[in-house]
A protein has these predicted regions:
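Acidic two-metal-ion nuclease catalytic site recognized across multiple nuclease folds
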Residues: 3, 13-25, 68-72, 166, ...
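Generic hydrophobic alpha-helical scaffold/packing signal
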Residues: 44, 83, 148, 224-225
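Conserved RNase H-like, two-metal-ion catalytic cores of nucleic-acid enzymes
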Residues: 45, 55-57, 68
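Mg2+-dependent endonuclease catalytic cores in nucleic-acid-processing enzymes, primarily RNase H-like
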Residues: 60-200, 242-247
């Protein structure tokens, strides 16, 4: 669909039952990070289809200060861009969090075995962590729910100037681009969960997510989910500190 515009979508707004509101997203660009965690990380969301964007973000703890994306690239070009982004921020393999579902070859190029001092090979399909296994079906459910809580608690933050960074996508109208903050507001409608008969929490499936955001892939928000998965125990600590309780 070459004729899609996020502005058109605003005019025919439907009920948005997402747990993350557009205001929650805007608030991320107006706060200085309150988090104690200062671990530097690079999250990488590979483009898995011809219409996804390849998106990388640099984080200091849960504060993002740099975003780079590409609409069209080969696997080789993606690897080169990841390496350049690492050099730019002075980081090594051990600070990487890469979504490897459908991109297993990356595990051979980068050291993504954390037990061997490497980075995180993010795979949402694996089991939830020891801390989350009673509450979540899969790791993706846990990471997405942690991301939701972190956003709502004001613990995920972005440099203000990134809100006005131009962002474009193959599915947007040819002549149009949007702003990063607007695209993230649009993508935020994916943050929907249901309670299974087992009592566990399940995140909206990929197919449903695509329907909620008109066939787009949530490339910008996926990076937040990956960060919260890669630093899940830090998330639990930050949330406990922010709420004054044990999570």
């Amino acid at each position: 669909n070459w004729n899609f515009s996020i502005q058109d979508e605003k005019e025919e707004e439907e009920d948005n039952l997402s747990e993350v509101t557009e205001d929650d997203i805007l608030n991320m660009f107006t706060h200085v990070s309150p988090c104690k965690c200062k671990k530097e990380r690079i999250t990488v969301d590979m483009a898995t289809t011809g219409e996804d964007n390849f998106v990388m973000k640099h984080w200091v703890g849960f504060h993002c200060d740099d975003i780079q994306y590409c609409m069209k690239n080969s696997n080789l070009e993606a690897v080169k861009m990841i390496k350049q982004f690492m050099v730019k921020h002075g980081l090594t393999d051990k600070e990487l969090i890469i979504d490897v579902q459908g991109n297993g070859f990356l595990k051979e190029i980068f050291n993504l075995v954390s037990a061997n001092g490497g980075g995180v090979a993010f795979s949402g399909a694996i089991a939830a962590t020891a801390k989350g296994k009673k509450l979540y079906e899969r790791f993706k459910d846990e990471a997405a729910h942690l991301a939701t809580q972190m956003i709502k608690a004001g613990l995920i933050t972005y440099d203000r100037q990134l809100a006005k960074m131009r962002y474009t996508h193959q599915k947007l109208k040819l002549e149009s681009s949007t702003l990063t903050a607007e695209q993230m507001q649009f993508e935020s409608r994916i943050f929907k969960f249901k309670r299974l008969p087992s009592g566990r929490i399940q995140f909206e499936g990929k197919k449903e997510q695509h329907a909620l955001i008109k066939g787009f892939s949530p490339d910008l928000t996926d990076n937040i989910i990956m960060l919260c998965g890669g630093l899940c125990y830090d998330c639990y600590r930050e949330l406990a500190g922010a709420t004054g309780g044990e999570l």
